[in-house]
């Protein structure tokens, strides 16, 4: 089979075919070549303006469904080589996970940021990476702790010690072991007396932290909102002090459903608010706590 000749040229006009146009392949081929030439021209112009890499691709929100275009391995190859060649903020793909908590469910993985943590940490992150945020909450609710305490800070919570590791294992399987561990500065102690930076009479605040191996984590307030709102002290932020580009470009992305495609649902954040509450993002977008 012969290939059509493709010339990078933008064609602004194309001869229309009529009922009297001979139905010969040459008539079709010449028009297809014009269309292919347009595509190539536009691609060439885009390549001139856009250099592959985290900086430029972080600046563009696309929101494209990659599920039936690339495999997980192909997506991760574009991440690990640092080009992010056909990956942009808001692009997403679906995976299926199975856990002892929620059984089988679909997770829509949204690209929220690229190379966010490069050179961060007490051990610097050296690998190219993409931050993935699920579009929706997992379908089964979970507590931060069994009682209304924040003892041990974020790291000491039941969410971190028991719940998140179960989902991390399931997601690691679904993502073909491509999730990388990074070091994150997370709260591990809370003073039960003294005013919280949350204000409004909240008592108790995070008063220590430690570098911790992290595979799966709740977001900080800054990663979601771009600023602290109810965080009890500077210990609640650590190195997680940059808003993900997903929420900068598309603030509506902070609203999540319960389970894949479910109705609106609030979700936990990592910040301690007081001796008895952690921060959350409400189903109505409100910065709140429980």
Question: Residue ranges of each PLM-predicted region?
Answer:
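Extracellular "spike/adhesin" assembly and maturation modules
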Residues: 1-47
């Amino acid at each position: 089979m012969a290939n059509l000749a493709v010339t990078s040229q933008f064609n602004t006009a194309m001869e229309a075919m009529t009922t009297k146009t001979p139905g010969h392949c040459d008539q079709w081929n010449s028009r297809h070549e014009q269309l292919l030439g347009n595509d190539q021209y536009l691609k060439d112009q885009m390549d001139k303006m856009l250099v592959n890499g985290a900086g430029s691709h972080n600046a563009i929100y696309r929101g494209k469904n990659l599920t039936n275009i690339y495999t997980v391995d192909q997506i991760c190859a574009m991440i690990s080589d640092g080009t992010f060649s056909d990956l942009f903020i808001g692009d997403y793909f679906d995976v299926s996970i199975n856990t002892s908590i929620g059984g089988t469910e679909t997770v829509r993985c949204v690209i929220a940021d690229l190379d966010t943590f490069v050179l961060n940490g007490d051990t610097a992150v050296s690998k190219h990476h993409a931050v993935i945020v699920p579009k929706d909450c997992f379908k089964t609710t979970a507590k931060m702790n069994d009682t209304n305490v924040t003892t041990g800070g974020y790291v000491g919570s039941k969410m971190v010690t028991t719940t998140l590791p179960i989902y991390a294992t399931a997601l690691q399987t679904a993502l073909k072991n491509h999730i990388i561990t990074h070091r994150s500065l997370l709260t591990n102690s809370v003073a039960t007396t003294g005013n919280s930076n949350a204000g409004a009479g909240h008592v108790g605040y995070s008063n220590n932290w430690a570098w911790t191996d992290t595979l799966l984590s709740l977001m900080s307030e800054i990663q979601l909102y771009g600023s602290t709102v109810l965080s009890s002290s500077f210990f609640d932020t650590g190195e997680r002090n940059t808003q993900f580009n997903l929420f900068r470009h598309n603030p509506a992305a902070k609203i999540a459903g319960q389970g894949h495609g479910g109705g609106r649902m609030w979700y936990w954040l990592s910040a301690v608010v007081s001796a008895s509450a952690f921060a959350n993002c409400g189903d109505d977008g409100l910065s709140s706590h429980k």
